[in-house]
């Protein structure tokens, strides 16, 4: 399926990006991403002040057992800004992180199986707060951003 740059909404963009990542990056690395439902919404937990510093939950993946649909639900925070290349890369990195959770239906948390998959697909750093390797950024630019454009969303600020 060919994806065209468009003025799509955020969820359509995430669906198209997930389709590209599922059939490309994850498949190439030997991982199967199940069907997921995607949305841009505030986290159900986190986003509070902890020891005087703000804690932002950038994404969440809910296991199928918590979803009446039986399909993993992935949420990306509207706090992130997709209006720049850097911002879109970060949003896509968070999406990749949440798709890693979906691969095993959130069974391994951020443990060893999660880390194996995450590092294979180009995530690095502390597994609870991964960042994108240069290799993953290059992959996302060429395979997701080139056909889809920037993520159609500007940062939403909260009080």
Regions from the language model: what does each represent?
Residues 2-86, 106-159:
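Metalloprotease/metallohydrolase-associated module, dominated by Zn2+-dependent proteases
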Residues 90-106:
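Active-site recognition of the HExxH zinc-binding catalytic motif
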């Amino acid at each position: 399926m060919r994806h065209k740059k468009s003025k799509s909404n955020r969820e359509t963009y995430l669906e198209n990006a997930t389709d590209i990542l599922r059939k490309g990056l994850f498949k190439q690395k030997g991982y199967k991403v199940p069907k997921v439902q995607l949305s841009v919404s505030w986290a159900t937990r986190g986003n509070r002040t902890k020891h005087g510093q703000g804690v932002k939950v950038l994404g969440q993946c809910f296991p199928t057992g918590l979803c009446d649909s039986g399909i993993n639900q992935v949420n990306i925070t509207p706090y992130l800004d997709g209006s720049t290349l850097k911002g879109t890369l970060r949003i896509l990195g968070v999406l990749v992180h949440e798709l890693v959770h979906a691969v095993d239906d959130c069974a391994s948390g951020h443990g060893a199986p999660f880390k194996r998959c995450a590092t294979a697909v180009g995530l690095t750093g502390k597994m609870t707060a991964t960042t994108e390797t240069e290799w993953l950024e290059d992959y996302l630019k060429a395979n997701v951003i080139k056909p889809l454009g920037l993520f159609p969303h500007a940062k939403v600020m909260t009080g």
